[in-house]
């Protein structure tokens, strides 16, 4: 009889143990899952925040570069409008050449500085190659009247700025070799009599822009 009672007591004890163990194990499993999920979610949020920061800082670097180019364009165009025309309102090409030469030499950021007249002909052009500015002789100046950036800039109002897409540079109707990607920043130019006389174009190297963007993202 005592053994039967003992067996009953052991069975009751086992039932009680299981009744306690199952909720405890379930609670432990839920806790472990919540802990793992919390860590994973924290890592995910941290990674996403880091990526957003990378993109934000790289975008800031890109915006800073573009803002600097626009500031340079406004500065040079204003200077040419004040100093680049005679009392009769006609272009003083030599004066504009010297202004452009000094500008591109000091800045060292631009592939070309150009003044195009109302017909789209280059009247002044300074290249920057091998670390030095180079004046382009009159017989080497080109007709750019069919180029999209000329037509779109000519349609602008005073104070408006044209910024081209990043594309390949074209010389004499052909893609320049070696390949050179550029962005063109341009504004209409007005003489001292308030008449539109052409456009000023800055060619900014796309490689420099992309390099600055990549450097900003990589250094974070």
Residue ranges of model-derived segments:
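N-terminal sensory and localization modules of signal-transduction and trafficking proteins
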Residues: 1-10, 50, 87, 155-167, ...
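Juxtamembrane extracytoplasmic/periplasmic/luminal helical "stalk" adjacent to the first N-terminal
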Residues: 13-16, 24-89, 105-109, 181-182
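Extracytoplasmic/secreted envelope proteins and their assembly/folding machinery
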Residues: 52, 70, 97-100, 147-150, ...
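Extracellular/periplasmic ligand-binding regions of membrane signal-transduction receptors
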Residues: 63, 67-97, 118-135, 219
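Short N-terminal helix-loop-first-beta-strand/juxtamembrane motif that initiates sensory/input modules
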Residues: 69-74, 104-129, 144, 155-162, ...
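Solvent-exposed, extracytoplasmic
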Residues: 93-107, 139, 171-172, 193-195, ...
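Extracytoplasmic/periplasmic ligand-binding sensor regions of membrane-associated signaling proteins
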Residues: 127-203
